[in-house]
A protein has these predicted regions:
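Catalytic donor-sugar/metal-binding loop of nucleotide-sugar-dependent glycosyltransferases
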Residues: 242, 252-271
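N-proximal low-complexity "stem/linker" segments adjacent to membrane-targeting elements
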Residues: 1-62
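A recurrent flexible, glycine/aromatic-enriched loop bordering the glycosyltransferase active site
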Residues: 185-194, 208-227
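Short beta-strand-to-loop acidic/aromatic patch adjacent to the donor-nucleotide binding site
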Residues: 138-152
Length: 408
């Protein structure tokens, strides 16, 4: 059973009673009559052939309260898009697949590129951005959840607990972030959150002093969780990063746009496992190494927008402070693991901390050397201002793809 402690300045909604998914779904069915609910699934084609997504779709097919499911499909040929249409066709809910590599959406992307408004990098951020645009264009839902497609431990209760806070009309939340314990196969996972993000936030607070943004970020129990839910109006104004800083960037945007009492986090799963990234000790352009650099730069950029001045000496101090805090965390997690009968390899943990410490300096150098770097994709409000018919064009492209290849 979870505790009921409220840490930080963001409301935490706990799983206190293991309430049945049927009871949650019964309420969500009633909420959906007045506030239609949707789901965004950003996916790579390769995930359709894995273990996680087929099982996930079987669960989603049984969800009674969804009015729309939007699937963003990346890295797919024409034949693979056709396969995807059949793969998702047994979903009883209204659904559409965005073929991001198809000629129609590529043509729209090129139009936006000429206006300087297209996402500059391929990846999850770009995929999510176009899915958000489609939700705005289709105008079928008032609240929408988003989660990854590689969750090996998925069940319907995860989605129900994720979307409930923005579905309940008696709640005033605009945004909800999921959290869970990353424990699987007898060990504690979640290295980047445990060994980079939390100790780095503590180091920044120690180095820079009291800061509302850092207090806000440190309130989230699992800041890198890929599971969110939003009210529809959030999608108009949000600017999201196109790199690995997506999860941090979304939280930063929520901090910028909304007061703390409109935001919450929800305990959505007792167990959670997904595909794991390599540490990439010798390649800072891949795996957890690149992820750590992108995340760290996202934090530095946000702090700079608030007036924090960075220089090489500052980054050295942050790195040294981080290193000591992170090493202390390893001992804490080791003791937690031992008491719970779990494994935790201290040597591997310290190698990760050493890599992350180096990458804090790399992120700082990159931040200083590239002051004009703008990884954020423009908000849909800005895109509509520049191209007023963009949402209609997006909707038409997706519907024409669907009609051409599925014949419906």
């Amino acid at each position: 059973m979870a505790d009921f402690y409220q840490n930080g300045i963001v409301t935490t909604l706990h799983n206190l009673e293991n309430r049945s998914v049927e009871a949650l779904e019964s309420e969500l069915n009633e909420f959906a009559k007045k506030r239609p609910l949707g789901l965004i699934l950003p996916s790579l084609f390769s995930e359709l052939e894995g273990k996680a997504l087929p099982a996930t779709i079987d669960h989603i097919a049984k969800v009674p309260y969804l009015n729309e499911v939007v699937i963003g499909l990346d890295r797919a040929t024409k034949e693979q898009y056709q396969y995807a249409l059949k793969f998702f066709s047994h979903l009883p809910q209204q659904h559409r697949v965005l073929w991001n590599d198809g000629p129609r959406l590529q043509a729209l992307d090129e139009e936006l590129r000429k206006l300087g408004l297209a996402p500059k990098e391929l990846g999850k951020g770009r995929n999510v951005w176009y899915c958000m645009g489609f939700v705005l264009a289709s105008n079928r839902v008032e609240s929408v959840a988003l989660h990854d497609c590689d969750i090996l431990t998925y069940d319907r209760s995860l989605l129900a607990r994720l979307i409930y806070p923005v579905a309940n009309p008696q709640f005033n939340y605009e945004f909800c972030k999921g959290f869970y314990a990353r424990v699987a196969d007898g060990k504690i996972n979640g290295r980047v959150s445990r060994l980079l993000v939390t100790p780095l936030l503590r180091a920044l607070k120690h180095t820079l002093g009291q800061n509302d943004y850092l207090e806000f970020m440190d309130s989230f129990r699992y800041p890198l969780a890929g599971e969110f839910s939003f009210r529809r109006d959030v999608l108009n104004d949000i600017r999201i990063p196109s790199d690995w800083g997506l999860e941090i960037g979304v939280l930063s945007e929520m901090h910028r746009n909304y007061s703390h009492n409109r935001l919450c986090q929800s305990d959505i799963a007792d167990a959670y496992d997904h595909k794991h990234q390599d540490l990439s000790l010798n390649n800072d352009q891949g795996g957890l190494s690149k992820m750590s650099i992108d995340i760290t730069k996202a934090l530095f950029r946000k702090l700079a927008t608030q007036g924090t001045v960075f220089n090489t000496e500052t980054f050295r101090t942050i790195k040294a402070t981080y290193f000591r805090i992170a090493l202390d965390f390893i001992e804490t997690y080791h003791n937690d693991a031992v008491m719970n009968g779990l494994k935790l390899d201290i040597h591997s943990e310290e190698k990760a901390v050493e890599l992350f410490a180096k990458n804090i300096m790399k992120a700082g150098t990159s931040f200083l050397d590239n002051p004009m770097e703008t990884p954020f994709i423009p908000s849909w409000n800005r895109v509509v201002s520049a191209k007023p018919d963009v949402l209609e064009c997006l909707l038409r492209a997706v519907e024409e793809d669907h009609k051409e290849f599925l014949g419906q």
